[in-house]
């Protein structure tokens, strides 16, 4: 992803194209409305908002939107902004855990959650500000935890999400188990991408389909009737 972004940026400069990645401030202006919707639909400010973090556009933008609501007097406090990254791609979570003043890029990030497989997030500093200014935190989850939560969300909620989206819910589970999140907190967890954004991951976990002859006896046999 990081090299692809560099190439696209170069292409925009040399060929006059318009970059709509999270480096684009107008994109963040759109993403900040997630914060507006949260407050509008809940009718209150949650204690915590948890988001998956890759390029860190969402967590930065939501924090910006909520700050605007605070400045306008629509809310009286900010929720704790909490980011979740994959263990193999976690420059922001590492900076939070180690108390680093800046995010140190990771040269070779690796995770099954491709949407957050980003070693040099363009909004890293904004994300650090969002987390630290609100008393939030950041954590990591393994690929195994991500895949397990992806299955749980589908089975228990009927929602198909891509692996990166499942990371945010898996992160809550991890933080609760570690005692970093109070069970009584009111939490909004953002799942950002649909299952069809990355269907190959789910297909790879499924048993191969059974092929039978087109007759009733073969069907009954396959169904163990």
What would you call each of these model-derived segments?
Residues 53-57, 123, 157-165:
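Short glycine/threonine-rich catalytic loop with a Thr-x-Gly-x-Asp
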Residues 32, 38, 42-64:
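Glycine-rich ThDP/TPP pyrophosphate-binding loop and its adjacent helix/strand module
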Residues 169-225:
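Catalytic phosphate/nucleotide-handling subdomain of diverse soluble enzymes
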Residues 47-52, 77-84, 184-190:
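Beta-strand segments within the central parallel beta-sheet cores of soluble alpha/beta enzyme folds
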Residues 40, 64-68, 170-177:
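Short glycine/serine- and small hydrophobic-enriched flexible loop segments
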Residues 1-21, 26, 68-160, 202-225:
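Active-site/ligand-binding loops adjacent to catalytic centers
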Residues 20-43, 70:
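A structured beta-alpha segment of the ubiquitous adenosine-cofactor-binding alpha/beta core
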């Amino acid at each position: 992803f990081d090299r692809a972004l560099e190439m696209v940026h170069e292409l925009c400069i040399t060929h006059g194209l318009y970059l709509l990645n999270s480096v684009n401030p107008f994109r963040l202006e759109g993403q900040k409305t997630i914060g507006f919707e949260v407050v509008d639909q809940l009718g209150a400010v949650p204690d915590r908002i948890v988001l998956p973090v890759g390029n860190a556009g969402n967590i930065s933008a939501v924090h910006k939107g909520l700050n605007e609501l605070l400045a306008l007097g629509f809310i009286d406090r900010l929720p704790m902004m909490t980011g979740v990254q994959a263990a193999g791609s976690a420059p922001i979570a590492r900076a939070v855990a180690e108390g680093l003043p800046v995010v140190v890029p990771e040269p070779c990030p690796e995770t099954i959650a491709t949407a957050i497989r980003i070693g040099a997030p363009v909004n890293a500093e904004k994300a650090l500000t969002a987390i630290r200014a609100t008393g939030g935190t950041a954590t990591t989850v393994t690929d195994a935890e991500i895949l397990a939560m992806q299955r749980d969300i589908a089975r228990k909620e009927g929602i198909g999400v891509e692996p990166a989206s499942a990371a945010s819910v898996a992160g809550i589970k991890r933080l609760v188990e570690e005692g970093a999140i109070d069970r009584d907190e009111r939490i909004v967890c953002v799942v950002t991408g649909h299952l069809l954004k990355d269907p190959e991951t789910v297909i790879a976990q499924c048993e191969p389909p059974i092929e039978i002859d087109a007759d009733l006896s073969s069907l009954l046999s396959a169904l163990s009737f």
